[in-house]
Structures are given as C-alpha cells and as structure tokens.
Design a protein with these regions (language model features):
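N-terminal auxiliary segments of SAM/dcSAM-dependent transferases
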Residues: 1-39
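Glycine-/small-residue-rich active-site loops that bind phosphorylated ligands and cofactors
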Residues: 48, 151, 184
Length: 218
C-alpha cells in the first residue's frame, strides 16, 4: 500500500494534491489526489472514488447502520478504488468477505495500492465485465453494491429488468442492493423505479445532487 507523507496529508485540507496520474488500457487518464486526507480517484469528467467521503456509499450505508453488523458477504460491481468497502471497514468496523469487480484492471491495481482493504485476507479483486460476472456467479451475498458508470452515464444493461432480477437472485434472504444511478429524464427514473419495486420487497430512494441511491431489500 502506498504511503502518503504527513506534509501532503496536512496540505490536502487546503486543496487537492496530486499523487499520480495513470493511463489505463483504454487510453483514459486517471488522476489520484489526496483531498481532505481522503484518496480521490477522478477523470476530467467524473469522480469515481473519494475515500470515506464517497457519497454513493457513505449516505446509503449510514441509512443501513442497523443492518451493517449482519453483513458477512459483499459484492461490489464497479469498484473504483473500493470506497464502498473502505467505508464499511473504516466507519463501521465491518470486514465482510468481499468480491470487488471492475472491467478496468488499472483501477483494481490502484485500489490495492492506495487502500489497505485486505487486512483480514478475505477480499478478492476480479477484472471482468459486470454482466458476464453476474451470469457466471454462483455465490450469494448479504450486500451488493451496483456503481457502474462510464463517465457520467450508467450502462443501459445495469438498469434493465433482466440484470436487476439476476442481482436479486444473488442476494441472500433479506439481502440488500445499493444502486447508484443517474437518469437522463424523469420518465427514465419512473421506469427504473417501477422495475425495482416489481422485483424487491422494499425500495428506498436517497438523493445527493444529481445522484440517486436506491436501497433495495430482497
């Protein structure tokens, strides 16, 4: 795990400080900064991880604080640096057996480099496309995080009824899905909400700026 100097940690409370830039297999440049003593992963168009301050998981997990002690297994689709797991570990002292899936090997490598996520030797990083992984997965999970973005867009398959049904099938009884999503229109939001409500027994919508976070109970 990369260590950040104390001087940079202190300076990061004033403005973001660049730690490195890395170009992935697809030619996209990813920037790693430390900001407010949190590691932040970004591209020119989006923030993909921001330590314990990553709203797509800090807000839903706070909402689920009474459920968190029961979370023994976690699947993350769209890992980024692994902020979802980082928040579980650092804010809630919870270390579930975890599978972190991302299509981008560069992001998985950065996750291992900057977040010390595997202290309990129960975390696996897998480079795979999310729908392919789900199609071939035979495990069950207490918690699934769905955070798939291409810049500021969510792939169409991630909002499809077929894919959401498959995720439902990967949850244990009383398992929970956290779905971070942006919509292009009110109509699209209504369609996706109807799909979720037709699959899961309880759906709660949380919001921060443009992002919608759905907490869906099996």
């Amino acid at each position: 795990m990369s260590k950040v100097s104390l001087i940079k940690k202190i300076g990061s409370y004033v403005y973001p400080l660049l730690l490195e830039e890395r170009t992935d297999y697809f030619g996209k440049v990813h920037r790693i900064d430390i900001y407010r003593n949190q590691i932040m992963l970004s591209t020119p168009s989006a923030i993909y991880s921001f330590g314990k301050s990553y709203y797509p998981f800090s807000i839903p997990l706070k909402h689920l604080k009474n459920d968190i002690p029961k979370i023994k297994s976690f699947l993350m689709l769209g890992t980024g640096l692994g902020s979802g797991l980082h928040i579980l570990q650092q804010q809630f002292n919870t270390y579930p057996k975890t599978t972190l899936v991302d299509l981008n090997q560069t992001l998985l490598d950065l996750s291992k480099q900057y977040f010390d996520l595997n202290t309990h030797h129960n975390v696996e990083w897998i480079c795979d496309e999310a729908s392919h992984f789900v199609d071939n997965c035979h495990e069950k999970y207490n918690l699934i995080g769905l955070d798939l973005f291409i810049d500021m867009s969510v792939p169409l398959f991630a909002k499809s009824e077929q894919f959401l049904l498959k995720l439902h099938g990967l949850l244990n009884q009383n398992g929970i899905l956290i779905f971070n999503v942006l919509f292009s229109s009110i109509n699209e939001m209504k369609i996706v909400e109807e799909r979720l409500e037709g699959i899961y027994k309880e759906v709660t919508r949380l919001k921060h700026d443009r992002n919608n976070f759905y907490v869906c109970r099996r």
